[in-house]
């Protein structure tokens, strides 16, 4: 751990589940991983290098290994931590799902503890439940569910500092299964509508924490950003803007909210096969409440090309490109028992 700071990270690891067998042991062979053109051995070794370089005290793993009939997320991540020789050897998770893409926290038990603390209220039920909202403005209540229920944790440092963390992976807006242009529009709008409902649900839980004066972090893959697609105009605001509101802060999201931003950050890099080119997107965030912001934490996107120090480190740069289609985001927070 860096002197007098905690480092928290969020990292979406593309198809982490494909690297483990039914006993949650890593498969280190030369067969394809879930990543296009990358073997399981190459992805695992790249992930080891990235996690070691992060040297974080806690890492929210989005698309964490599967929990199912035989497999267990906690056991798989513990095995990965041993393989990578990480000090983040403990794992916390909340509600499992059936997508093979879990949400879990790897953390250093010598630095902090993590406890699953799911909440429920009349206007924001527990995240594994059902949220009722009129999505279509047709005076009929729709039932909304999270395919990947957000992870609610209470983090307590050895010095007694308490942070509340919500880790999220919102619904993708991508029009999977579309057959033509009309399908693309219909599915995209339906997916955005559902994602916005998830954002409202999440925002209500956040407001509950903030009303109680909790120091709050909201992190993960929100699958959205201001101005990211043309359908946003139909709904007025992006999911990110709904979640962030006026009382949370993420400097990268703030840049996107500026009407004439010139240099746009990105946390993910995807390949457009139709046009044979890569494109970036800002999808991953670490939002903090006001007292945490006042402590002057430091954000960093571990982008292999945009970060000069990473670009000059060829081994780390290549590892980031092999490990996932997303890049980690870190937050260095002053390790003080009492925040300003």
Where are these regions (language model features)?
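N-terminal, active-site-proximal structural segment of metallo-dependent hydrolase catalytic domains
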Residues: 1-103, 317-323, 332-340
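Active-site-proximal beta-strand elements of phosphoester/diester hydrolases
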Residues: 5-18, 32, 117-118, 162-175, ...
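Active-site beta-strand/loop signature of hydrolases that rely on acidic residues for catalysis
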Residues: 11-12, 47-73, 106, 153, ...
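Short catalytic/ligand-binding loop motif for oxyanion handling, primarily in non-cytosolic enzymes
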Residues: 17-19, 67-70, 99-102, 173-175, ...
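A solvent-exposed, charged loop/short amphipathic helix patch at secondary-structure junctions
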Residues: 19-38, 173-193
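Structured beta-strand-rich core segments of catalytic domains in phosphoester-bond hydrolases
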Residues: 64-171
